[in-house]
């Protein structure tokens, strides 16, 4: 795992075998999944994940039924199932392409840099990856919305993806962000 993280951080990968060493450019995004019930990851490793999305099981019966129906439909005919969503997927892909091109135009006011630092301090995050990740994510949210300037609301939304896995907490705590802290800083 450490080798992957090093390659992701440096943008270079070194392969060594039988006395031969080869280094080449390596640009990739690491995407992982885990089940917290199977154990915890080291904090140093968690800090390397830019964002975390906590996926909970659906509790609404009608939505669960829809999930089951979708899965069965996909298993029966994957091509037909994918065609049903092709237009929606193409629109989303175009929105992402447009945002990627627009991203360099998105500005972050100095006030947001300060707020990001204050939020990270208030939530007890170690290091600076949380601050930087929150700013990058806020810019991305603004780009997706077609705005030229990141806002406090973008920063607040970004914090929910970037900070929970970085917060210092006891093993028995949930990692949920206390909303009153965020509101106090942003007010």
Predicted regions and their residues:
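Conserved RecA-like P-loop NTPase ATPase core
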Residues: 4, 33, 49, 116, ...
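Conserved catalytic/switch belt of AAA+ P-loop NTPases
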Residues: 1-21
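C-terminal engagement/docking regions of AAA+ P-loop ATPases
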Residues: 115-132, 140-187
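Conserved AAA+ ATPase "SRH/arginine-finger" region at the nucleotide-binding site
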Residues: 52-62
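Acidic catalytic patch
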Residues: 105-116
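Conserved AAA+/SF3 P-loop NTPase catalytic/coupling segment centered on the Walker-B
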Residues: 1-8, 40-48, 61-66
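Conserved AAA+ ATPase "sensor/coupling" helix adjacent to the nucleotide-binding pocket
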Residues: 66-105, 119-122
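AAA+/SF3 P-loop NTPase mechanochemical coupling elements
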Residues: 15-33, 47
């Amino acid at each position: 795992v450490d080798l992957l993280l090093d390659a992701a951080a440096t943008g270079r990968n070194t392969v060594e075998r039988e006395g031969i060493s080869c280094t080449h450019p390596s640009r990739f995004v690491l995407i992982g999944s885990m089940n917290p019930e199977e154990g915890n990851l080291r904090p140093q490793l968690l800090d390397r994940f830019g964002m975390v999305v906590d996926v909970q099981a659906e509790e609404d019966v009608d939505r669960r039924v829809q999930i089951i129906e979708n899965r069965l439909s996909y298993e029966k005919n994957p091509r037909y199932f994918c065609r049903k969503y092709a237009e929606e997927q193409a629109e989303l892909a175009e929105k992402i392409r447009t945002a990627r091109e627009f991203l360099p135009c998105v500005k972050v006011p100095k006030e947001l840099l300060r707020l990001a630092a204050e939020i990270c301090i208030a939530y007890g995050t170690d290091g600076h990856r949380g601050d930087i990740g929150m700013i990058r994510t806020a810019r991305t949210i603004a780009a997706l919305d077609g705005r030229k300037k990141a806002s406090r609301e973008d920063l607040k939304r970004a914090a929910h993806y970037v900070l929970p896995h970085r917060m210092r907490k006891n093993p028995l705590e949930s990692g949920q962000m206390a909303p009153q802290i965020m509101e106090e800083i942003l007010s």
